[in-house]
């Protein structure tokens, strides 16, 4: 049987919507396929566009008032004096991880008041 694409297209142009719906159903049944559009999986660029919910507070620089920054880090994290000093001395370093946006912004503001440079990741 010869396949005449132009004849098929001409036949489809003359068909009614009901005839075309029946044709689609018959093709789906005959070839065990679905005419439904595939649903794209979430992720990739769409995932990056989603609102971020967890933030890490990174101390990028202690500034000139290192003692005040160490005190603020101790208050925020509950670390001991040595651990807080090491964290500040080894900047850039993560002060706290997995905070919600409000808590991360509060901690950032508290550290910046002491003269530290802070970024949210």
Swiss-Prot record:
<dbReference type="InterPro" id="IPR036235">
    <property type="entry name" value="Ribosomal_bL12_oligo_N_sf"/>
</dbReference>
<dbReference type="InterPro" id="IPR008932">
    <property type="entry name" value="Ribosomal_bL12_oligo"/>
</dbReference>
<dbReference type="GO" id="GO:0003735">
    <property type="term" value="F:structural constituent of ribosome"/>
</dbReference>
<dbReference type="InterPro" id="IPR000206">
    <property type="entry name" value="Ribosomal_bL12"/>
</dbReference>
<protein>
    <recommendedName>
        <fullName>Large ribosomal subunit protein bL12</fullName>
    </recommendedName>
</protein>
<comment type="similarity">
    <text>Belongs to the bacterial ribosomal protein bL12 family.</text>
</comment>
<dbReference type="InterPro" id="IPR014719">
    <property type="entry name" value="Ribosomal_bL12_C/ClpS-like"/>
</dbReference>
<dbReference type="InterPro" id="IPR013823">
    <property type="entry name" value="Ribosomal_bL12_C"/>
</dbReference>
<dbReference type="GO" id="GO:0003729">
    <property type="term" value="F:mRNA binding"/>
</dbReference>
<keyword id="KW-0689">Ribosomal protein</keyword>
<comment type="function">
    <text>Forms part of the ribosomal stalk which helps the ribosome interact with GTP-bound translation factors. Is thus essential for accurate translation.</text>
</comment>
<dbReference type="GO" id="GO:0006412">
    <property type="term" value="P:translation"/>
</dbReference>
<comment type="subunit">
    <text>Homodimer. Part of the ribosomal stalk of the 50S ribosomal subunit. Forms a multimeric L10(L12)X complex, where L10 forms an elongated spine to which 2 to 4 L12 dimers bind in a sequential fashion. Binds GTP-bound translation factors.</text>
</comment>
<dbReference type="Pfam" id="PF16320">
    <property type="entry name" value="Ribosomal_L12_N"/>
</dbReference>
<keyword id="KW-0687">Ribonucleoprotein</keyword>
<dbReference type="GO" id="GO:0022625">
    <property type="term" value="C:cytosolic large ribosomal subunit"/>
</dbReference>
<dbReference type="Pfam" id="PF00542">
    <property type="entry name" value="Ribosomal_L12"/>
</dbReference>
């Amino acid at each position: 049987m010869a396949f005449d694409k132009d004849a098929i297209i001409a036949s489809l142009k003359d068909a009614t919507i009901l005839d075309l719906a029946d044709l689609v159903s018959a093709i789906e049944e005959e070839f065990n396929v679905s005419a439904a559009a595939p649903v794209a999986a979430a992720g990739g660029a769409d995932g990056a566009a989603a609102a971020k919910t967890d933030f890490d507070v990174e101390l990028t620089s202690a500034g000139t008032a290192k003692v005040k920054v160490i005190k603020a880090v101790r208050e925020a994290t509950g670390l001991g004096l040595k651990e807080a000093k090491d964290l500040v001395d080894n900047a850039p370093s993560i002060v706290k991880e997995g905070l919600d946006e409000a808590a991360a912004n509060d901690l950032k503001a508290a550290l910046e008041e002491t003269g530290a440079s802070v970024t949210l990741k």
